């Protein structure tokens, strides 16, 4: 498949780009600074320098893509609109170019369904009012805009991301099957006791979902 990955210089974007190339996909990595791309040159890798917040800037990178993956995320916990603004820009560019498949990395903090009572009624409400309030609000606004679009979207809601190595099992099953090897997945609900997942396993889950029609217009939770 022809994939366009935005946020390709981040930790999650690097995993996505590397794994996509290893799986045989053609990848267009959209970056602000090509020097920050931590993926070696590859015959199926095209690097495009563009501003993800400018639909006209990213439109050439999005045009002709079989799927567009947004791994842009906030760098800290302060006030931010980076997820919402990037999602809005991508939606506009996709509408203009006719691209249809959109995969967005969000977070489990935005939703409660499927959580244990302890997480649902104590931990998450506190986190949303304090240190994660800006990040959560930004992700929620982004999700609202994506759901309001007519794209074939899938939103991924991982918990805290780690730098651990891939289990090698997350891509063995489709995301909508309820389990992905050593990682658990769920559709339109969070996972109880799902506290962390590696970026490598998240990337494998995203790539396994690219052509899965059961995942279109659904939210996918993944956790270790």
Label every PLM stretch briefly.
Residues 75-102, 141:
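NAD(P)-cofactor binding segment of oxidoreductase domains
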Residues 165-168, 178-183, 209-218:
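Glycine/proline-rich active-site loop of Rossmann-fold NAD(P)-dependent oxidoreductases
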Residues 143-164:
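Conserved beta-loop-beta element that borders a ligand/cofactor-binding pocket
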Residues 46-65:
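Conserved Rossmann-fold cofactor-binding substructure of NAD(P)-dependent oxidoreductases
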Residues 198-224:
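Alpha-helical substrate-binding/gating segment
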Residues 82, 87, 138, 156, ...:
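Substrate-positioning beta->alpha
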Residues 30-35, 51-52:
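N-terminal Rossmann-fold cofactor-binding loop
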Residues 3-23:
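N-terminal Rossmann NAD(P)H-binding glycine-rich loop of SDR-like oxidoreductase domains
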């Amino acid at each position: 498949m022809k994939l366009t990955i935005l946020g390709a210089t981040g930790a999650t974007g690097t995993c996505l780009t590397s794994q996509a190339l290893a799986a045989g996909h053609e990848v267009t990595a959209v970056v602000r600074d090509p020097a920050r791309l931590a993926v070696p040159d590859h015959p199926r890798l095209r690097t495009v320098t563009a501003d993800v917040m400018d639909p006209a800037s990213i439109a050439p990178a999005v045009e002709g893509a079989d799927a567009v993956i947004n791994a842009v995320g906030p760098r800290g916990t302060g006030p931010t609109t980076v997820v919402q603004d990037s999602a809005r820009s991508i939606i506009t560019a996709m509408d203009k170019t006719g691209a249809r498949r959109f995969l967005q990395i969000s977070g489990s903090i935005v939703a409660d369904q499927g959580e244990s009572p302890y997480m649902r009624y104590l931990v998450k409400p506190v986190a949303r009012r304090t240190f994660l309030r800006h990040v959560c609000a930004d992700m929620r606004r982004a999700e609202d805009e994506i759901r309001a679009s007519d794209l074939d979207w899938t939103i991924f809601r991982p918990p805290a991301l780690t730098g651990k190595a891939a289990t090698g099992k997350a891509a063995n099953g489709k995301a909508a099957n309820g389990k992905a090897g050593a990682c658990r997945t769920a559709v339109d609900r969070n996972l109880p006791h799902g506290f962390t997942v590696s970026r490598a396993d998240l990337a494998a889950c995203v790539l396994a979902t690219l052509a899965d029609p059961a995942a279109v217009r659904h939210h996918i939770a993944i956790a270790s």
